[in-house]
């Protein structure tokens, strides 16, 4: 009996129903709730699992390199990046007929292949890889790192190598290690790779281990570094006629501030990128020496926080008590980490297209669309997770005595003001934005499109002008040709910036108008509503006027029985659950906007977006319907084409999405009755009744069914849009 699943909970292992299985899976990673868990074992388990996570990541990236080297066309792509389609891997499928074999044999391949829309070809090319042998070497190295990570994870579970709790809670040492050791040293190492391998590679010089020590990255070597003449490293940059990967038009500079884009590759100058990483390395190497550890110098974080008491008294006891609150709560730390990572991931989505760093990636439109959408969705899930763990912190780890009248306690004390302000902002944005859209729809429907309310985003245009965009005629700061900022910019810093901002061939500072104004506020509505639900969930997690003892019920509970009416759907988990729908909704609007705007930009008919994006029917007809036409014809009675797999995935995504509603709309009692009927039929059916079960079948709990519904809704939603995005973009641009 003791060996039944789950072994981490004897109470659950003895449950006679199928609840044992589902609750076991649901709580498998909730280490805090396991039998016999101690704080020390909790920290050690999480620490060891990090190495397993790293091993999986290294194995996965190794697989990418290996499959491209084995089945891809990297060497052919390198010869002509703009016209050869990069191959991710081969496809073998016994169901393929001759039309499918022909449709999927692309990129110069002999048989069916998948085209890579991940941008890895451009990345590998930019950082200096040129041959399949390079890819195999990288795959082997990452495989080696994966094995090392697994060994390290196993090692740190052995008694002799298990770190103590005090080691885990040594915040200063950890910060120093992460800032200097991880960010600082890795940025410096990456600068080294760019300067020694990637930049020579972009100039037609093949640097590998055999000649690494013989090839000077700069004609003057380390001389300028030691003599303080650092500006010599910026002299003689690549010319505007430079052909990437060759010596034609190349220079000798290694660290520059050119600004703008390489004219041929449409990506940032590699020498600018190296300079950026060197600066980052310097900042983090210094930052990693700020905190007091072994030598008695530097800051103590606890002292810093204890001293943060604003003299005006408006923030009470300021940051007193926060050090121990944060340092003793893994949920608080995870919440902070997820919030930071979520913001960074969204910034990555934004910057990968507006300031492309990889050679020729800006001209690979499908890859640009896929990467933007991918990173925005990931950012959404990570950010909602941050609030989820913030709420769990308030329920499990928050100590009111320890935080009396500090900034954290004061957040809880005036939560009504915070929540009601967010509610007011959401209502204002929602009614006004929808009102404008609907008004415009009515005007078009009644044949008077000239009566639409079209608002120019003059403040945003002014900001773009201040950064150098001249087309609006604002004549301010960098767009003012006789101003000091403009003149300094032409020589001292980023001379290429102004020409890049005013080029219409890139995505830097797109020209904006009334359609952008409206969708911007629609997105603002989504962001504020998502935030409202998440913030309310966290701030009400310990209790509310309706349910003051809420924290005693834990993070996820359906209701407090029939005796307390109105306690359903108010757990912190329910807030997270509702917020994910709004998050998906918001990112849908963000990606629709980005994609439609860019399709018209790439096709050279931006006026279609400008004219149709000011009313809802325009979005439905001229974006969704118009761009799904190729998808809907991916296969039909007359045959199929290379979009057929996306057409099928589009259909399948809708199916998964719709399945979600089955769990979201019908609740536990319906399923319980159905299960009991099915069990009755099973037990009375010959042959079938030879199969018995130990656990009595019961329906999922309300919370679990909601999770299953949410998972189907999310996965189906994203699958559907991914298929639409890739097919509609690749169908137009190849």
Swiss-Prot record:
It comes from Citrus sinensis (Sweet orange). [4Fe-4S] cluster binds at residues 559, 568. The lineage of its organism: Eukaryota, Viridiplantae, Streptophyta, Embryophyta, Tracheophyta. It is a multi-pass membrane protein. The PsaA/B heterodimer binds the P700 chlorophyll special pair and subsequent electron acceptors. PSI consists of a core antenna complex that captures photons, and an electron transfer chain that converts photonic excitation into a charge separation. The eukaryotic PSI reaction center is composed of at least 11 subunits. Its main location: plastid. GO terms for molecular function: 4 iron, 4 sulfur cluster binding; chlorophyll binding; electron transfer activity; magnesium ion binding; oxidoreductase activity. It is an enzyme of class 1 (oxidoreductase). It catalyses: reduced [plastocyanin] + hnu + oxidized [2Fe-2S]-[ferredoxin] = oxidized [plastocyanin] + reduced [2Fe-2S]-[ferredoxin]. The gene is psaB. This is Photosystem I P700 chlorophyll a apoprotein A2. Its EC number is 1.97.1.12.
């Amino acid at each position: 009996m003791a060996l039944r699943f789950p072994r981490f909970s004897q109470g659950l292992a003895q449950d006679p129903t199928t609840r044992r299985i589902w609750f076991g899976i649901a709580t498998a990673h909730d280490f805090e709730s396991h039998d016999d868990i101690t704080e020390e074992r909790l920290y050690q388990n999480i620490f060891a699992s990090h190495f397993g996570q790293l091993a999986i990541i290294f194995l996965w990236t190794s697989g990418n390199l290996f499959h491209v080297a084995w089945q891809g066309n990297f060497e052919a792509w390198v010869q002509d990046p703009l016209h050869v389609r990069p191959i991710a891997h081969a496809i073998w499928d016994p169901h393929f007929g001759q039309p499918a074999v022909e449709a999927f044999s692309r990129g110069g391949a002999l048989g069916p292949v998948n085209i890579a829309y991940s941008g890895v070809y451009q990345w590998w090319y930019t950082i200096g890889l040129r041959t399949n042998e390079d890819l195999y070497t990288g795959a082997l190295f990452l495989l080696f790192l994966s094995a090392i990570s697994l060994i390290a994870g196993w090692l740190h579970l052995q008694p002799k190598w298990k770190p103590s709790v005090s080691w885990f809670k040594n915040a200063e040492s950890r910060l120093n290690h992460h800032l200097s050791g991880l960010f600082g040293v890795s940025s410096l190492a990456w600068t080294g790779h760019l300067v020694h391998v990637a930049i020579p590679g972009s100039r037609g010089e093949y640097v590998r281990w055999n000649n690494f020590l013989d090839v000077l990255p700069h004609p003057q070597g380390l001389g300028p570094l030691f003599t303080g003449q650092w500006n010599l490293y910026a002299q003689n940059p690549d010319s505007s006629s430079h052909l990437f990967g060759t010596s034609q038009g190349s220079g000798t500079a290694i660290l520059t501030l050119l600004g703008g884009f390489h004219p041929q590759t449409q990506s940032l100058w590699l020498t600018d990128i190296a300079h950026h990483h060197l600066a980052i390395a310097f900042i983090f190497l210094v930052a990693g020496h700020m905190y007091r550890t072994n030598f008695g110098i530097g800051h103590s974080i606890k002292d810093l926080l204890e001293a943060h008491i604003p003299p005006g008294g408006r923030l009470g006891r300021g940051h007193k008590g926060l050090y121990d609150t944060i340092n003793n709560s893994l949920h608080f730390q995870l919440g902070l980490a997820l919030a930071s990572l979520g913001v960074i991931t969204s910034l990555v989505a934004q910057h990968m297209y507006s300031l492309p760093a990889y050679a020729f990636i800006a001209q690979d439109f499908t890859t640009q669309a896929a990467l933007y959408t991918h990173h925005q969705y990931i950012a959404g899930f990570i950010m909602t997770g941050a609030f989820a763990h913030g709420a769990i912190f308030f329920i499990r780890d928050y100590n009111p005595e320890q935080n009396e009248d500090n900034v954290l306690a004061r957040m809880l004390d005036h939560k009504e003001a915070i929540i009601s302000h967010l509610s007011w902002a959401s209502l204002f944005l929602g009614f006004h934005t929808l009102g404008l859209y609907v008004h415009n729809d009515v005007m078009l429907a009644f044949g008077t499109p000239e009566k639409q309310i079209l608002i120019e985003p003059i403040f945003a245009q002014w900001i773009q002008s201040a950064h150098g965009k001249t087309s609006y005629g604002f004549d301010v700061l960098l767009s003012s040709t006789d101003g000091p900022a403009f003149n300094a910019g032409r020589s001292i810093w980023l001379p290429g910036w102004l020409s890049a901002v005013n080029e219409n061939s890139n995505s830097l500072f797109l020209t904006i108008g009334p359609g952008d104004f409206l969708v911007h506020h629609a997105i603002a509505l989504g962001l504020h509503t998502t935030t409202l639900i998440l913030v309310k969930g966290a701030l009400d997690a310990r209790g509310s006027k309706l349910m003051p003892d809420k924290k005693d019920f834990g993070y996820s509970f359906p209701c407090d029985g029939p005796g307390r009416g109105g306690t359903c759907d108010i757990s912190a988990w329910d807030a997270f659950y509702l917020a994910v729908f709004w998050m998906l909704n918001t990112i849908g609007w963000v990606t629709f906007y980005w994609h439609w705007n860019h399709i018209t930009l790439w096709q050279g008919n931006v006026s279609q977006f400008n004219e149709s994006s000011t009313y809802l029917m325009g979005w439905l007809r001229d974006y969704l319907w118009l761009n799904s036409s190729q998808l809907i014809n991916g296969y039909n009675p007359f045959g199929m084409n290379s979009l057929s797999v996306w057409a099928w995935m589009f259909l399948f995504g809708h199916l998964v999405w719709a399945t979600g509603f089955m769990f979201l709309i019908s609740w536990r009692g319906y399923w319980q009755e159905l299960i009991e009927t099915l069990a009755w039929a099973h037990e009375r059916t010959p042959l079938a009744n030879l199969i018995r079960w130990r656990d009595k079948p019961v329906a999922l709990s309300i919370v679990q069914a909601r999770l299953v519904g949410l998972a189907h809704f999310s996965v189906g939603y994203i699958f559907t849009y991914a298929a639409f995005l890739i097919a509609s973009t690749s169908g137009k641009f190849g």
